[in-house]
Amino acid sequence: MSIKVGINGFGRIGRILLSNALEKPELSVVAVNDPFIEPTYAAYMLKYDSSHGLFKGDIEVDGQNLVVNGKPIRFYSERDPANIKWSETGAEYIVESTGVFTTIDKAKAHLNGGAKKVIISAPSADAPMFVMGVNHKDYDGTPTVLSNASCTTNGLAPLVKIVNDNFGIVEGLMTTVHSYTATQKTVDGPSGKDWRGGRGAAQNIIPSSTGAAKAVGKVIPAMNGKITGMSFRVPSANVSVIDLTVRLEKAASYEEITSAIKKAADGELKGIMAYTSDEVVSTDMLGNNNSSIFDIKAGISLNPNFVKLVSWYDNEWGYSRRVLDLLEHVAKVDASKK
């Protein structure tokens, strides 16, 4: 089964999606669209990455094509998704990774060019959200536009699922200590409604809002209204960490909670949830394929019903991996419906 993929937006996530797709034999990226760069510049940015290093493969440019490991990838430069001729390359599954077209109405414009399904690599206000290992099996082939939620929701939801399934969560608060992203400022500048967000990203720890915790309630309905959270944007280029503090229904020692997480990570959530007892720091998680890596030694329990859990995630690499996993899952479900 060969799944032909198109990528709209060749920013951080778009480029890392392409790099990851090359490791998946069932996926073939046949087209990329980005109106702000030329193919030669796209090739340069794909080859050299300040966080993930030199691209492991061959990259060339042939007219309007990128040629990656000998395979041509058509490069478009359309501002309006409705004008991208995905059908020219046979691209049926489109990853919408611009961060702009995140509603059903905006993202479905890709269907005009021949796309079959659109997966938004960001949270969406109205598209159904799916998180691998949590609710991906709920996909029934019906939606034409769906969301892979956020990197933080992907890091948080598997952890919440394990804890709630085993011990029950009464309520919880999450803080993500999050690396800065492209939307932030390198030096102080205007930032509309979010004044703190306009301060220099490399100089400050910046409190910020996040909908990631509330979004868990959309993929785990039992958690709706029970978890919320916030973010601290910190002077780090990549890798983030979740601090989840929960009150449990069923009393449990920290060791029992750890045992439940390890069991799930070695079983049903293998490749999505992982764990470590090493004395790790953020850079040790660069390029980690998992959605969430539970740090056994970093958590702490106040009493058997109140515990803090810590879990790392590569907010670029691990998240991009899940987008592609979801795409593969969607394509297989779609094929089974024919």
Curated annotation (Swiss-Prot):
Residues the entry annotates as binding D-glyceraldehyde 3-phosphate: S150, C151, T152, T181, T210, G211, R233
Binding site for NAD(+): R12, I13, D34, R79, N315
Active site: C151 (nucleophile)
InterPro entries: GlycerAld/Erythrose_P_DH, GlycerAld_3-P_DH_AS, GlycerAld_3-P_DH_cat, GlycerAld_3-P_DH_NAD(P)-bd, Glyceraldehyde-3-P_DH_1, NAD(P)-bd_dom_sf
GO MF terms, alphabetically ordered: glyceraldehyde-3-phosphate dehydrogenase (NAD+) (phosphorylating) activity; NAD binding; NADP binding
Major localisation: cytoplasm
Chemical reaction(s) catalysed: D-glyceraldehyde 3-phosphate + phosphate + NAD(+) = (2R)-3-phospho-glyceroyl phosphate + NADH + H(+)
GO process annotations (BP): glucose metabolic process; glycolytic process
UniProt family annotation: Belongs to the glyceraldehyde-3-phosphate dehydrogenase family.
Protein name (record): Glyceraldehyde-3-phosphate dehydrogenase
Annotated source species: Hypocrea atroviridis (Trichoderma atroviride)
